[in-house]
Amino acid sequence: MNESLVPLPAAALVGLLREALDSSLVERGVLQGFELLGDRGALWSSLDLDELERMASAGNASAQAELAWRHSVGQGVARSPAAAARWATASAEGGCAAGQAVLGWLLYEGIGLPRDHAEAARLFALASKQGEVRGMTWLGVCLLHGQGTTADPRAAAALFLKAAEKGSAAASYWYGRLRYFGTGIERDYTAAARWLQHAADDGIAEAQDLLARCRFLGRGTRQDRGGAVGLWRQAAVAGLASAHFSLGLCLYAGNGVAADAAAAAGHFRAAAESGLAGAMFLLGQCHVFGIGAPRDVDAGVAWYRRAAERGSREAEFELGECHALGVAGLARDAGEAMRLWRAAARKGHARAAVKIGHAYRWGEGVAENKPLALAWYRRAAEHGERAAHVWLGECYEHGEGSRRDPVAALAHYQAGALAGDPHGMAEYGRCLMAGIGTKPELREGEAMLREAAAAGWSQALDELARQRFVRGERLLLAAQDAGDPGLREAVECFRVAAEAGHRRAAFMLGECLRHGTGVRVDLALAASCYLKAAALPDAKLRLADIYYYGQGVRRNTVRALHWYLEAAAAHRDPYAMYSAGYCLLHGEGAPRDPRAGVHWLRQAALHGEADAQYELGLACFSGNGTRRSMRLATKWLRSAALGGHDGARDFLQRMALGRRLN
């Protein structure tokens, strides 16, 4: 499980935008159709109020319709639903198509009159028969959604087209919309873009919004993300929440416009305050992570909650993460995290399904249930979560929740790799190299591991090195003699693993080069290999000896002492402690330091190092770096002699005979 929260990356937001543009997230809904009122007669809309009232009072039905409309929306006059209903009724009773349309709209909205969709649809039909474009458009919306009449999207499309051809911008929008979604008529993005362009040119924000989708996705028109951003800006100025949301996503991700997190946050806020759940979630992200807005975790979590209450699966997932980790001011609560992840998963959130799978697999917040974990991973994979294939592969490989099935494991790792998941590439490459679920394919496996590393999965190189090292060791152990051809392959395996950073492989390559195993002797190259493996105690000792004895390099006792001391201090190696003590005692690689020399000799002697016991015995005999003590000298020399040290035995014999000793 993650140790900390991370914001959605820009690339993920582009994906979120594409998903939003193909969902109902940015659709305005039915009522917005009745906000698109279309063109009124230029004559009537241009009359001043006094002239209009005089004509209406004189019984002019068209003037009555216009006056009704102005009273209904408060245009140039105080808004008065009652006056609107009175004038619209008078106009409609006079047989005026415009009056019938306006009265129908009032009945539909319940403005000044009880809401009555059936009567509204009847009046729209009367107006439509007289060729009134608003009546046609509004009747089309009723037919589209089955409000006040039987739903008939095909008939709605025909009415929208007829009204659009008469110049109705509102009808152009609706017809373009039906063409875009293929509702009641064959989907045709090209026709959709053409009709939406007519409506957008007349300033209809909803048309600008949908046309922007066409431009952004290249549907029915050439892809032009900059042009899409321009249209969303126009629609956002008109206050369209979905346009604010889409524009915010583009600004956040720098798609079609220069990235501007502060501006993005502003548009998310505008859309969020209009009730758009996706915008609430992203505004929460901005506050939680301080992206384009002041960092305010409490405010961010509050927006997450509001978004979750409105059904945002992303917000539910993020709140689950907060509770699982006990961050963002929320108590650690595995049960609440599971509840939120379940809610998100029910809406198709694939990563939430993975989290639930993890919980059941490892018993975090719920009873461990491997088969159920497997089912959740499978669900996540079916919803497009490429990483889920890795977890499925692990379960099948190790028999978690199912019998062991290396072939199925390999198939899932391959699916993850083909989907571009770096972890999947690494696991697939490992299986190819190790022959899991298939015969070993070393070249293909190595190539896949390198591809995984290039894609950002750094552990892939470690796996490559491990696989090569293991094979190299097997070949080395299986070799029958010095001429075995497997030795050359072993050397190559060690070389590849060493280049990938495997220290033990670098050491083994050095050993092969030093002894001519599977390769000609090259002490200088061996030294460079030991240097790569210098974190290992054996490599430190090899380096020290190479420099001390001048094997393949110029003799350098300073460097030799350095590596002896490194091995002695870091690994407490008896030979290293003896060698460091010897050099310090005799002034090799550093000025003589008998006390320090005796210190290291004593440490090595206590570990049973015979050479150190011999040198320590001599030091005690002569008082070199320590007080003179025949008892201690005899003790250490006897220990060395028992360990097979000939010099110690000879010295003890001479002591016994009383001969002169140096």
Regions found by a protein language model. Name each.
Residues 29, 57-60, 73-75, 80, ...:
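Short helix-capping/linker turns of helical repeat alpha-solenoids
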Residues 35-36, 66-73, 102-109, 136-145, ...:
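Hydrophobic face of amphipathic alpha-helices that form TPR/SEL1-like repeat modules
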Residues 39-46, 80-81, 116-117, 152-153, ...:
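Helix-turn-helix repeat elements of alpha-solenoid scaffolds
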Residues 443-457, 530, 534-535, 628-646, ...:
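TPR/TPR-like (Sel1-like) alpha-helical repeat modules
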